[in-house]
UniProtKB/Swiss-Prot annotation:
Pfam families: AMP_N (PF05195), Peptidase_M24 (PF00557). GO terms for molecular function: manganese ion binding; metalloaminopeptidase activity; peptidase activity. The lineage of its organism: Eukaryota, Fungi, Dikarya, Ascomycota, Saccharomycotina. It is found in: Membrane. Its EC number is 3.4.-.-. GO terms for cellular component: cytoplasm; membrane. The keyword Nucleus does not apply. Keywords: Hydrolase, Isopeptide bond, Manganese, Membrane, Metal-binding, Transmembrane, Transmembrane helix, Ubl conjugation. It is an enzyme of class 3 (hydrolase). This is Uncharacterized peptidase YFR006W. There is a cross-link at residue 50 (Glycyl lysine isopeptide (Lys-Gly) (interchain with G-Cter in ubiquitin)).
Length: 535
């Protein structure tokens, strides 16, 4: 068919136009169809070139729908602290009150021109939502006015780091009433000469006149801040949920990648890599990545042993998202199949967690749930033969023999810190069963906690908790115990939101042992080309 030149131009223009329409529609779908959105959480596409299932590429800037276009609610947090502080100390209602917090500053490494990793003061962040070093906030309880003080512009720093956030930009980004520079602090404090001004500490307060006008370390002020942080608002809950979603996929990646995980450090690397690719710029704590007998160390820090010849892996790792952290632990067999002893221990811990989970609701006493998990452990150990059958469950419980295998608490508060504030622990408790329990209060709605029972076979724990206490050692069949030592330990940890009538498990990665075996086995069948192709 022969077309005139003018017709070719028109035809080409139409093709180009419809091509653009298709392109932008496709782009819109990509923008609204991120892998991290709940409705696409389990969606995958098939790569014909590689002949394998692959996840969609994550959008590192994806923001949860519920908090999209919302500022971090700093004003609301300040108002809650104010109400709790005045209720705690009614005398303050008769005088003018304010609180001031100086944020963390960049700290240099000795003898070089690099800085330590910056981590914002959590109290400061909770009352500001600001992650800028050397900033400060002032909240006037009389006017409910929140003022942010940004560091003065350093021309030399601009040469290397670019222009910092301007005052106008700060007003648009943060939930504040006023933005000033640090150089304006003195003038602002002159307006508050008759105020009682509370602060956390004087560590980053460099003006002596301002320091003299502050009241540091007041227990009522800390109570008000801790209680406010303990009960999460909607924005905080969605932030933790997002952190959990990032960690879910990172744990799945670790379970699926044993062919390229020859050392514990490579387990850590796999988790951090996938967390970073999803926008988790840091972890909430140093990850625990251990194998074999090392799994019996509660907070293992080496992450350096080869995995060859080990039967078990334990990874305790949680990504942060916008300062809020997750905290998830999973265990899996290196062969893709639990050994008989590993499976028994795993199902014991899973039963401990499930029994506690069923009872999580407002008003539940954490002490009672913790004690319950010890009783579940004792029941299983009697069945396994580790505890001698001539002793009753109650007798073993009273002797605290289970503490040799489960020395830590059932869980802790979770939020801006991995071991968040507000749990009211009592580390001086003479009872070994409760000494390390980090929550010693009834649960309340909108608390976020971890549910993380464990079972460990650790020579040091056996020596400290059994051999030094004959009444405990008496109930243990050491010949049976020896068969389980190679397992090291098992801990299963989920992040739980206490709801009005019960709980919501924010953790999505499976803890079902059959499903875990399938995930590991599928990963073991992948060829080398199915993973990172360079190293």
């Amino acid at each position: 068919m022969c077309l005139e030149p003018i017709s070719l131009v028109v035809f080409g223009s139409l093709v180009f136009f419809f091509g653009l329409v298709k392109y932008f529609k496709r782009g819109e779908r990509q923008r609204t169809r991120g892998i991290l959105q709940p409705e696409y959480k389990d969606k995958y596409y098939y790569s014909k070139e590689k002949g394998e299932e692959m996840g969609e590429v994550a959008n590192v800037n994806e923001i949860p729908v519920k908090i999209r276009n919302h500022k971090y609610p700093a004003k609301e947090h300040n108002l809650r602290v104010k109400d709790l502080l005045l209720n705690r100390n009614p005398k303050l209602s008769k005088i003018s009150t304010a609180f001031f917090i100086a944020g963390e500053e960049l700290e240099g490494n000795k003898y070089c021109d690099t800085n330590k990793d910056f981590r914002q003061n959590r109290y400061f962040y909770h009352l500001s939502g600001v992650d800028i070093p050397a900033s400060a906030i002032l909240f006037n309880c009389s006017t409910d006015k929140l003022t942010l003080f940004l560091p003065n512009i350093d021309e030399e720093d601009v040469i290397w780091s670019g222009m910092p956030l301007s005052l106008d930009e700060a007003m648009r980004v943060f939930d504040i009433d006023e933005a000033l520079y640090i150089s304006d602090l003195g003038k602002k404090f002159k307006e508050l000469q008759d105020f009682a001004i509370f602060t956390t500490d004087l560590d980053n307060v460099h003006d002596e006149n301002i320091a003299r006008s502050l009241i540091p370390s007041d227990p009522n002020f800390f109570y008000a801040m801790d209680e406010t942080r303990a009960i999460k608002d909607w924005y905080e809950i969605e932030s933790i949920r997002k952190a959990c979603q990032i960690s879910d996929k990172s744990h799945l990646a670790v379970m699926s990648a044993l062919p390229i995980e020859l050392n514990e450090l490579q387990i850590q690397a796999e988790f951090e890599y996938h967390a970073t690719r999803q926008g988790g710029r840091s972890l909430g704590y140093d990850p625990i990545c251990c194998s074999g007998p090392a799994c019996g160390t509660l907070h293992y820090v080496k992450n350096s042993e080869d995995i060859k010849g080990k039967h078990s892996i334990l990874i305790d790792a949680g990504a942060e998202w916008r300062q809020y952290t997750s905290d998830i632990t999973r265990c899996f067999p290196t062969s893709g199949k639990f050994t008989a002893e590993h499976r028994e221990v795993y199902e014991t811990v899973l039963d401990m967690q499930n029994q506690a989970m069923e009872r999580i609701k407002p008003g539940a006493k954490w002490d009672d749930l913790h004690a319950l998990t010890h009783k579940v452990l004792i029941k299983h150990f009697l069945s396994m033969g580790i505890f001698k059958k001539e002793f009753s469950e109650d007798e073993i419980f009273k002797r605290r023999a289970s503490c040799a295998f489960y020395p830590h608490g059932l869980g802790h508060m979770l939020g801006l810190d991995v071991h968040d504030v507000g749990g009211n622990p009592n580390y001086d408790d003479p009872d070994p069963m409760f000494r390390y329990l980090r929550i010693r209060r009834p649960l309340k709605e909108n608390m976020v906690i971890t549910n993380e029972p464990g079972c460990y076979f650790n020579q040091f724990l056996i020596k400290e908790f059994l051999e030094k206490h004959p009444e405990r050692l008496e109930v243990v069949d050491m010949s049976v115990l020896k068969r389980y030592m190679y397992v090291g330990g098992v801990r299963i940890e989920d992040d739980i939101l206490v709801t009005k009538d019960g709980y919501e498990n924010l953790t999505g990665i499976t803890s079902d042992p059959d499903e875990i075996e399938k995930i590991v086995q599928k990963g073991l069948k992948k060829p080398r080309s199915g993973f990172h192709v360079i190293v």
